[in-house]
Amino acid sequence: MVSVTRRSLLLGVGTSAAAAAALALGGCSLGQAPTRIRMACGEQGGTYVQFGELLRDALTRAGTTGLEVVTTGGSVANLELLKHRDAELAIVLADAAATDAQNKVAIGRVYQNYLQCFVRRGGPIGGLEDFPGRRISIGAPQSGAALTARRVLTALGLLDGADAVEVSELYLDEAMTALETNAVDAIFWSGGLPLPAVQSLETEVELVDLTSALPALEVDHPGMYTLAAVPASTYGSAESVRAIGVSNYLLARPDLPDDVAEALVDVLIGDAAQLVPEGSLGVQYLTASNLIDTSPIALHPAAQRRYRQLYG
């Protein structure tokens, strides 16, 4: 596994675009699957990396192509890696992907993310009414969580004006430490259920219901966000908590070889049960009818053909 930081991204990861592409696809003749492809995922301790590792293992079992899991800040960083040819695949939140639907294609819609806002149980925040003036980490720099959280806070009138919160962008490990040490009052995270890093916290946490932002979000971003629920006991709560859901897309560069795109479709459908992290409670989209719903991002032509071959 390799890690890409904002600094290394801005420096081009030490290679030109052409050299990066040659490295990833080196040793392959035209029409053959590359020996290894790179998938931009997310932060250690999050569900993007979990999914990337499971997909890597599934491709290894299938004997089709190797996959290198790249840790990043999240969706926005992943889009930059695709754009600059420093990754062949990326997992990206649908709202982040929709900010620029060009120069990328989709392999499929894979699972639902839940925008989660964690606070200390018994702390100063019991609900949204306690947010004004509080210190909030909205997610890592260049993460999809930060993008979605800013939209939610804007919809709630908490990003500007007299009720504005104090915003910071912390990586997951930093955010967890800050929450435990009272350096922040709440942290946002967008991911599957449960968030693995929460389970190792010594501090008890609970979720804040953010769904009063949904009507305003629907006006500004129609069809992008849905009402979801975090099941009871996910984080020790006796009751389920309403949440904001947004889809995740597995994206690729348009020049991803056809046979690789087809192999990915085969694994997503044929090995679906092995692509769900152990203990996962969230919504999965690993069926043909759900995988193909990647609007406004077009499916990779070879992936689309493969779905049709398999399911008409």
PLM features per residue range, with description:
Residues V2, S8-G27:
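N-terminal export signals
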Residues S29-G31:
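Bacterial signal peptide processing site
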Residues P34, T64, A77, Q102, ...:
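Extracytoplasmic
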Residues P34-A62, N113-T181, D293, I297-A302:
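Bilobed "Venus flytrap"/periplasmic-binding protein-like clamshell domains
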Residues G52, E68-V105, D173-L179, L193-L201:
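Pocket-flanking alpha-helical
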Residues A94-A97, D160-L251, D255-L256:
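Pocket-lining segment of extracytoplasmic ligand-binding domains
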Residues Q102-V110, I136-S137, S233-R242:
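A structural signal for short loop-to-beta-strand junctions that line the ligand-binding cleft
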Residues V241-G312:
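Segments of small-molecule ligand-sensing domains
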